[in-house]
Structures are given as C-alpha cells and as structure tokens.
Amino acid sequence: MRSRWIWRFLRPDGGGIRWTSTPHGRLSPALRRGFLTTTTKSDYDRRPVDITPLEQRKLTFDTHALVQDLETHGFDKTQAQTIVSVLSTLSNVSLDTIYKEMVTKAQQEITVQQLMAHLDSIRKDMVILEKSEFANLRAENEKMKIELDQVKQQLTNETSRIRADNKLDINLERSRVTDMFTDQEKQLIEATNEFAKKDTQTKSIISETSNKIDTEIASLKTLMESSKLETIRYLAASVFTCLAIALGFYRFWKEN
C-alpha cells in the first residue's frame, strides 16, 4: 500500500508533484530554504542539551526496499536512488524541524529542573534582599518616623509659643485700646465740661452785653428826647428872636 502511494505521488508522467533530482542525492538550496526554521532562546539561563544526536536518529522506512519498489514500477536505479535520497533528506529536515520546535520528555524534565533551580536561586535572593534591603528600609522608615515625630513636636511647641505670643499681644493691645478709650472718654468729658463752662460764660457775657446794649439804648433814647426838647427850645427861641427882629424892623420901617 505504501509503495503504491509513493508511486502515485512520485511517478514521472506528471500525475503527482514533479521533483527535480540533484547530484549526490542532495536537495537544491532553493528547496532546502523552504524547510529551514528559526527558534528563539528563552530569557532564563538554560544549558543546551541534545537528547537525540543526529547520528542516532533513524528513518521510519527502509530505503533499500523503497529503491527496489521504485525499480519494479518503472524507475531505473539512479532515479530510484535519487528519489529515496530526496525523501531521506526531507525526512531529516522534518526531524530537524521537529527537534527544534518540540522537546522530549527528558528535555522537559531537565528544563523543569533548571527552572526550579532558577526559582530557588530567586527565592534565596529574595530572602537575602529581605534580610538586607528590607532591614535597611525598615531602619530608614524608623529613622524617618523618629524625625517626623521630632518635627511634629517642634511644630507643636512652635505653634503653642506663637499662640501664647499672639494671646499676649492681643491682651496687651486690648489693654492699650481700653486705656486709650478711657483717656478719650476723659478728654471728651473734660471737653464737654469746658464747653459747658464756656457756654455759660458766653451766655453770661451775652446777657451782660444785652443789658449794656439795653441800657445804652435807653440812655440814647433819653438823650434823644432831651436833645429833641433842646432843639425844640432852640428853634422856638430862634423863631421868637426872628419874629422880634422882624417886628423891630417893621416898626422901624413904619416910623420912618
């Protein structure tokens, strides 16, 4: 069954995939490029272990029997050997790809052991870090806590001192304002008394002046009355004198 499938797949009449043979039974570089793959390394430390060396890897089919089967189906010996060489090379490339992309159970166990060793190393480093760095951090935190407590105490003392100073200043200012208000009140009372005294004196002077003015007005009225009488008397005497003179001239004129 296997020989018939290979015959249908590799027959030279074009019914299957056409293969190009190369000398010495090797694949061309263009054909090899399609089967080459790249693998990436892990980030952790790993010791490369090759469980199955290349010389110990065996093919899964009998190449001699396959050559004979191909010869019985119309291939000559050179073509049969070339086809078997190509199949062998393809199998080796496939095995290389499988061994590069996959691991065996033994490789997995070795990798797990390496990972566990790496984790143990990390755990030891963490313990050392906890004993050293964490202790230093704890000491630094305690030191900072003590410094913060000291700063807090200093701030409390400074706040209390400032509050006491402000309270004293407020009391002094209140006393000063009270004294100033008392002095102003005393000065206001004295000014009020002085104003009342001045007002009384002014009223007394005004009253005396008014009395003097009334007296002067009365005396002026009396003087005016007396002057009026004197004037009337003078005018009457003047009139009588003028009449007497006029009568004298009249008599004198009549007699002449």
UniProtKB/Swiss-Prot annotation:
It is found in: Mitochondrion membrane. Residues 129-167 form a coiled coil. GO terms for cellular component: mitochondrial membrane; mitochondrion. Residues 1-42 form a transit peptide. Signal peptide: none annotated. Keywords: Coiled coil, Membrane, Mitochondrion, Transit peptide, Transmembrane, Transmembrane helix. The chain crosses the membrane at residues 231-253. The keyword Membrane applies. Pfam families: CCDC90-like (PF07798). It is a single-pass membrane protein. Belongs to the CCDC90 family. Interacts with MCU. PANTHER family: COILED-COIL DOMAIN-CONTAINING PROTEIN 90B, MITOCHONDRIAL, PROTEIN FMP32, MITOCHONDRIAL. This is Coiled-coil domain-containing protein 90B, mitochondrial. It comes from Mus musculus (Mouse).
